[in-house]
Amino acid sequence: MPLMRIDMFKGRSKEEINEILDISYTVASKEFHLLPRDRYQIVTQHDPEEMIIEDVGLGFKRTDKFIMFSLTSSPRDVEDKKRFYSRLVKELHEKIGISPEDVMINITPNGKDDWSFGNGEAQFMNGKL
């Protein structure tokens, strides 16, 4: 169950945002073997002065189409993560023209005791999930 936060600059259409959401969910679902209805995505749009995104000296040419995917998730297999990174970038580029240099991904692992889906309960810990 990853929680996917997606940060981007303001200016995209609702349709493009929905495509980004659908593509990223489909890729995560396949590569991380998610259960049905295991979809938690939050989009935040920023003014240009609210995000400074450099390239760590890698020579990337960032544009106003930059997207940051930050996932909080149970630990994932290294090979699954590599496939997720590669496929997400490929799908975004092929389907909506986002440059691979404009996609940054970060996955932060956490445990089952770090989640409550509602009612103040730890559903992973009390057997409901």
Spans of features found by a protein language model:
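Interaction-mediating elements
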Residues: 1-129
